From Swiss-Prot:
Catalytic activity: all-trans-beta-carotene + 2 AH2 + 2 O2 = echinenone + 2 A + 3 H2O; echinenone + 2 AH2 + 2 O2 = canthaxanthin + 2 A + 3 H2O
Protein name: Beta-carotene ketolase
Record organism: Paracoccus sp. (strain PC1)
Classification of source organism: Bacteria, Pseudomonadati, Pseudomonadota, Alphaproteobacteria, Rhodobacterales
Pathway recorded for this protein: Carotenoid biosynthesis; astaxanthin biosynthesis
Biological role stated in the UniProt entry: Converts beta-carotene to canthaxanthin via echinenone.
GO biological process terms on file: carotenoid biosynthetic process
Keyword Oxidoreductase: yes
Entry annotated with the keyword Transport: no
E.C. no: 1.14.99.63
Domain of life: Bacteria
């Protein structure tokens, strides 16, 4: 697997397999928590479900992110757009056209005032700016409707609807800290090049758990944006050859 070049049939199979696994795991755990979980009787299980959904929600966003770069199904822009929009809908009802436009701007102007992901001040202020960039009036109108509809369908279990928005919010914090703030914050140390991005240098297990390698290998991502998340560690080990 490590000897293939990105975009080969083998890589596409791996991309689609991992994408399907993340989507399926999220859907199964989402359905379980909303319809079957007894949080009062099993509080530890409820916490584990929340943690699992948070990590899988990060995974949904990463699927959409890779789709933006055309790396889920290389050479198939419509397939990437469909998969990316599905992942964003499940994550928080976000708009694919809006996010892909802003993300491409981020890559062109990373770490500058023209970067929609870049912010000034401390991490809390920067996070607020980061969220407001992607969470607009459309999401502000759509999400309450979805949550209310969910609550009505759940009936007596209406409180379990929190297992959709809460993991999404926690995931956004996780994505921001490990995928934006740590890699792009100025003044911490010198950036290696014009991409104004650094890799956090944490080990591969933590890199996977925190942000599907987009923190641990963020500079590598800016150097090789079409490399899918699971191949990012390979780019460093091979000196840039994915």
């Amino acid at each position: 697997m490590s000897g293939r070049k990105p975009g080969t049939t083998g890589d596409t199979i791996v991309n689609l397999g991992l994408t399907a696994a993340i989507l399926l795991c999220w859907l199964v755990l989402h359905a379980f928590t909303l319809w079957l979980l007894d949080a009062a009787a099993h509080p530890l299980l409820a916490v584990l479900c929340l943690a699992g959904l948070t990590w899988l929600s990060v995974g949904l966003f990463i699927i959409a992110h890779d789709a933006m770069h055309g790396s889920v199904v290389p050479g198939r822009p419509r397939a990437n757009a469909a998969i990316g929009q599905l992942a964003l809908w499940l994550y928080a009802g976000f708009s694919w056209p809006k996010l892909i436009a802003k993300h491409m701007t981020h890559h062109r102007h990373a770490g500058t005032d023209n970067d929609p992901d870049f912010g000034h001040g401390g991490p809390v202020r920067w996070y607020g700016s980061f969220v407001s960039t992607y969470f607009g009036w459309r999401e502000g109108l759509l999400l309450p409707v979805i949550v209310t509809t969910y609550a009505l369908i759940l009936g007596d279990r209406w409180m379990y609807v929190i297992f959709w928005p809460v993991p999404a919010v926690l995931a956004s914090i996780q994505i921001f800290v490990f995928g934006t703030w740590l890699p792009h914050r100025p003044g911490h140390d010198d950036f290696p090049d014009r991409h104004n991005a650094r890799s956090t240098g944490i080990g591969d297990p933590l890199s996977l758990l925190t942000c599907f390698h987009f923190g641990g290998y963020h500079h590598e991502h800016h150097l090789h944006p079409h490399v899918p998340w699971w191949r990012l560690p390979r780019t460093r080990k091979t000196g840039g050859r994915a």
